[in-house]
């Protein structure tokens, strides 16, 4: 079948197309590539596994070489142990046999090979070998005789499949190029300090054409004009100075990148997925593991056959063809196990195996089918040639670490998910406060973190914003609820606490004080929340808390009170009613500004009336509240003095104040009547 070769030299990627499908990828990326020749230094010799580690310049991983791959050293002493062949700090000439994978370093060999277009030179090899794909016996005899004549002394030679039918001059010229290359490597090895890279196929286009070009290729597309010239030059040198007939060489000129235009990137994305759909409706699942690669075949939605036997046979044959292509595309190597759909007929099993073996012949890695097991599994092996597609284009998932799933253990769901604000109990939420403010209680010790809630209390400055008198929790309590609250609080003893009350800790430590527990004239004892029990590994299982209470010392804070400002406003009775009804302050009628509108005394007089300015302000007493909390917790003492209402709250003219003035006037009239009646009665008795 005709093939096309797409070369993206900029990205060092080439693809081989056949029947509008990518059959194979060639990627030349990575620090160590197959065929690289290094001058290495032996680091460690391990006689237990007959191997050694060689430093080839990689600071992270050393190369691995087995005793069977030592090459010229082993040829001299065949039966010797590796400790007699290698020693630490010894210089060795090695070639990369397998690229590094995962935590493993590159596999090295001492059997150096230099591949050419028609022959492969083996400097430390012996004899002459021919490719198995050359079928003609007369051609094999011709090439064998030619190789014996031109083979350098003391070296080996391998004749490739491309040499079939080629003239002798082209084969000899190819061998001479390889001999010059080997001489340059030897000279550089003598003058270079180890470890060092001595040789690499830097010409990506030459490498692709050497390994992939054949008589069945009818089109080559390159992404650069210089690459186009080099392709023509290489092909002319290999064809006696003439461009091969029937071959189209193109330069990609489209605006879209060459990898996107020919859907190479899309094919790579699909190849990284485990599922591959078949044309008939079935599909296969490819799962690589550390030990082997498992491939499962499923019929899927294929129901076009008349019988179940035909459906199974057709699906297995389609799967065999697709599996052979996926092995080349993904470059899967090692042990491979294929689970075809169960077939009862032995004849059908042999037919599928024959079809599978025929599809694998186009693979240059020479996969070998081992056997068909009793469970219906097909076992085969494939030689490793470079990194697979998962190592080249795949990265480990940061979420699962490559497992393919994340772990969710019992009881961890609640800890991972954030708690919605609507589900937080009301007793754990800080409630808003209103004016007036109490003196700030500042403690000398830092607040503790309660492990039961996983959060710490806020700083002490927030205590100054508490309004205990107007707190909603105290407004909702009637007399019965107050008695129940005192009863529950009294259950908290000195040596222990109730389990329920111990868990009901309020986020605000002042929330235990009720309206009747506050004494602004004297000391105020504030109860802190009880501590949670801590587990102990002793005999009793729980330990008594050594220190159950902590005394928090506070210093009294004296508020700075400024005398109120007195302002006189002239207003008619009608204006007073309108301002009171609409809630408008009389201060808007003043032309001068007021320093503090919240601390001012407004003297309202009628127009033309002489204002009477008060000379002294008598502070009103504040209701006293005596604390009666019996909780054995840290206490905070606060000292406060009564503050004039005029200094903390602005005077507001409302309808309520007018009614209070009317009530006061009526009360004074009744007192006068009582006095007058009492005086009349006394006069009557005297008479």
Swiss-Prot record:
Enzyme class: hydrolase
Pfam families reported in the protein's UniProt record: RNase_E_G
Localization per record: Cytoplasm
Motif (C4 Arg-rich motif, necessary and sufficient to confer PNPase binding on another protein): 670-678
Main subcellular localisation: cytoplasm
Xref: InterPro entries: NA-bd_OB-fold, RNA-bd_AU-1/RNase_E/G, RNase_E/G, S1_domain
UniProt subunit comment: May form homodimers or higher order multimers. Interacts with polynucleotide phosphorylase (PNPase, pnp) via the C4 Arg-rich motif (residues 670-678). A homotetramer formed by a dimer of dimers.
Its biological purpose: Endoribonuclease that plays a central role in rRNA and tRNA processing and mRNA decay. Has been shown to act on 9S rRNA (the precursor of 5S rRNA).
Catalytic reaction list: Endonucleolytic cleavage of single-stranded RNA in A- and U-rich regions
Residues reported in the UniProt entry to bind Zn(2+): 397, 400
Superkingdom of source: Bacteria
Any single biological process term in GO: rRNA processing
Name the UniProt record assigns to this protein: Ribonuclease E
Annotated GO CC locations: cytoplasm
NCBIfam families tied to this protein: RNaseEG
Disulfide bond among keywords: no
PROSITE patterns given in the database record: S1 (PS50126)
Residues annotated for Mg(2+) binding in this entry: 296, 339
EC number: 3.1.26.12
Organism: Nostoc sp. (strain PCC 7120 / SAG 25.82 / UTEX 2576)
Span list, region Disordered: 650-687
